[in-house]
Amino acid sequence: MNTTIPLTPVQSHASPITALVHEHEVILRALGVLEQLGGRLEGGQPVDREALGWLLDFFRTFADRCHHAKEEANLFPALERHGLPRESGPLGVMLAEHEEGRALVRGMAEANDREIAKAVRGYVALLRAHIDKENSVLFPLAEQLLSEEEQRALAHAFEEVEQAQGPDLHERLLAGLARLERS
């Protein structure tokens, strides 16, 4: 498996949209591991509960408090200023899917094996489709609408989100994900 994708994609040479795409690549890797665990549950096989718990924390921390926070607090408002409505259209769909994903992760944390397996299937399908929509529709639109100055401000805002999550968080998450991919 590819473990060379950086988990700290907001770099001085990367656009904020490129940073979000890199984060999607990391999230897709974690979804692959989660999907394997879900398949084991569906097949009645034992599952490493610690690994499952770690993945749920990864999705809460990296996908939601880092990645979705950047979108919801920074990217989406920037796009709203260019006329995209928050309640409908692409932004409305993305926000609804973020909420649906949060509910599925909460459900996985509180469910029995059969319900976890079902929630895993739903979450993996939701996020893969969501990522595809953002990468192929929303992000190209953002790159088209946002000026260089707006993109620089967005990159700075993304850095602030990163700093608020604590030092070395992404490196620790990437190391943990790489361990799970190898196991």
Language-model regions: role of each:
Residues M1-S183:
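Small-residue-biased structural context
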